Amino acid sequence: MSIRVWAMIETARAVLHAEELAAASRDSEMRLAGFVFGPNDLSRETRIRMRPGRAAMIPMITHCILATRAYGLEILDGPYSDLGNTDGFGQECAQGRDLGFDGKTLIHPGQIEACNAIFTPPADEVTQARKILAAFERPENASRGAISLDGQMVERLHADMAKRTIAIADAIAARAH
């Protein structure tokens, strides 16, 4: 059994070298599974003020997400510190999900349920994902790169995205039982 490690990205240098760090995952000795974005330490070091919406931090976030995706790694969003602001927490989780984070690090048990709900694919999205996969599995579509489904063009890349959505939903459902 190999223990996997996660790299904290919490300094300006780490952000600037995110691609090099992610590339190191190709070395089997590194055992790098992904990054954890550290907004609080990064804010301190860069003097960026932590504001709702994190506008000033978005370029750094997307840079790190691109680096992880280029090398097939996962990335988790950092913690949300305002424990009393459940609306703000939910908004930041949704923003992180929409930006491409795979999840969020949490600092209080009260954050688990809301975070899981936000990062869990909605039922309608899972239904659509299953429909996309079923359409591409039909013999007449087996060699096609794109098809028409419910009046929309759907490419094979959407089938790949659908597989991921279903895998996440199935993994979450399995843990619930």
Protein language model features and the residues they cover:
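Expand to "…catalyze enediolate/carbanion chemistry for C-C bond making/breaking, isomerization
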Residues: 1-177
